[in-house]
Swiss-Prot record:
PROSITE patterns: KH_TYPE_2 (PS50823), RIBOSOMAL_S3 (PS00548). Residues 39-108 form the KH type-2 domain. GO terms for cellular component: cytosolic small ribosomal subunit. This is Small ribosomal subunit protein uS3. Part of the 30S ribosomal subunit. Forms a tight complex with proteins S10 and S14. It comes from Mesoplasma florum (Acholeplasma florum). Belongs to the universal ribosomal protein uS3 family. Keywords: Ribonucleoprotein, Ribosomal protein, RNA-binding, rRNA-binding.
Amino acid sequence: MGQKVSPNVLRLGIVRDWEDTWYAEKDQYVKWLDQDIKIREGVLKLLKDAAVSKIKIERTNSNITLIIRTARPAIVLGQEGKNVSNIATAVQKIAKDRNLKVEVKVIEVKNPDADRTLVARWIGEQITNRASFRTVQKLAIRKALKAGVKGIKTSVSGRLGGVEMARTEGYIEGSVPLSTLRADIDYALYEAPTTYGQIGVKVWINHGEVIGGQSQRVSEKAPMNNDRRFNNKNNNRGGRK
């Protein structure tokens, strides 16, 4: 029986790199991994309005570097770098090391309509605000294709429209070859809170194939004539299956 796997994990070491870059001895590995999870949660909480796409962590025994990809770099930096200082203090508190040197690098996401995390979050926020789950998916797909992605697939799961039975509905346009390992496919999951429970939002975005180590991201506009809709009724709540 076939099993589903995250496209991000499946491509690690092939066309995708790890989001944590460091080496630790056996007794220190678990400690650092636990800290990284808490650091991401803490930073995302501090920057909840900054449209953060991804946080990459690089570290040694005495230094830690946070590479934050965001669509709103001004919010991340803050007035006179105030937010950067707050982030550094929060990281030192989590690591329980006041002497830890913390460096924050900010990379601007220039095309948020083609970013998997920001697209999933936008769809989820619109659903939380009682927008039509079908309309927001179609709009997100149109904007992503206009941004130049090769293909995009969206899926929402839960008590859609407040009905009693949970189900899954989604759309796909363009090419999204999940089994092609050289395909540069991004995947994101967002859980949208509503008055009738959690709605799971999944987004897959194909940026093209990675050939010779070179990504073809947002190079050509995906075709508009490949529009397929799927509808899977099930009893699962939320986006996890």
